[in-house]
């Protein structure tokens, strides 16, 4: 039986977590609620901010990075959540040109799967 590979928006580029450092950069309500609770109870905010750089759902919600223009080419307006600061180097336009990029590796894997019924 064939498996079903899946990847989320940005995986094909190797997009990374944005590394937001301010709570105002986040939009995820459970994260914001825990932050408010920690403030109210004297929790360790510094440790919490480090942890959410890896665990918050907003890490997978940043705009897709199409190119190196403002907002990664995602919009000419203001995105609802900030663009990853690395959009100038990790973006679809740059990776499309690089035969050794993560994007082109994904393309090779997709082609391999199409050509091989066992996969």
Please give the residue ranges for each predicted region.
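Loop/helix patches that line or flank the sugar-binding groove of alpha-linked glycan CAZymes
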Residues: 1-119
């Amino acid at each position: 039986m064939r498996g079903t590979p899946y990847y989320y928006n940005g995986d094909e580029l190797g997009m990374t977590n944005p590394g937001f450092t301010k709570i105002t950069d986040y939009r995820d309500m459970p994260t914001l609620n825990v932050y408010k609770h920690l403030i109210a109870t004297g929790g360790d905010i510094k440790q919490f901010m480090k942890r959410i750089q890896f665990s918050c759902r907003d890490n997978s919600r940043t705009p897709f990075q199409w190119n190196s223009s403002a907002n990664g080419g995602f919009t000419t307006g203001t995105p609802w959540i900030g663009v990853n600061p690395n959009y100038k180097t990790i973006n679809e336009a740059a990776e499309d040109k690089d035969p050794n990029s993560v994007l082109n590796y994904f393309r090779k894997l997709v082609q391999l799967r199409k050509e091989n019924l066992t996969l």
